[in-house]
Amino acid sequence: MKRMNGLELVENLNKVSEEIEAIFNSYKGEELSYVDSIIMDRLETEAHIIKKALEDNGLYGAFLDYIKALEDIQVISDKIEFGVAKFRPAFYTAMELAEDRYRKAKGYLMSKEVLVDL
């Protein structure tokens, strides 16, 4: 058992997801090797354990808010960077709101301690 806060869980879930994606992308539709299939099983089990820990501890909603806020910030940043949002105050207000949602979700995730069997 390992004690982690909710944000550490989210970071671990993101890391596991990236590893799974990298393995899938390396095979491009071919069958996984025996070793990679074992690694994939371990990663999928770890992702399931983390997701279950988030759900069981009431953190899954905050996790979704955190991810959505990050996506919104990225989309708005891209629009501002490429001039789509130039001179449109609504984009800057939307950015402030997304950053506020991000801070709240991150703070909530950081404030909750969880025991996880990883």
Placement of each model-derived feature along the sequence:
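Short terminal alpha-helical segments
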Residues: 1-44
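Amphipathic alpha-helical binding modules
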Residues: 70-118
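Charged, low-complexity interaction regions
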Residues: 24-37, 59-60, 79-91
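Non-transmembrane amphipathic alpha-helical segments
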Residues: 16-23, 50, 69, 76
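Short, solvent-exposed, charged loop/turn and helix-capping segments
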Residues: 46-65
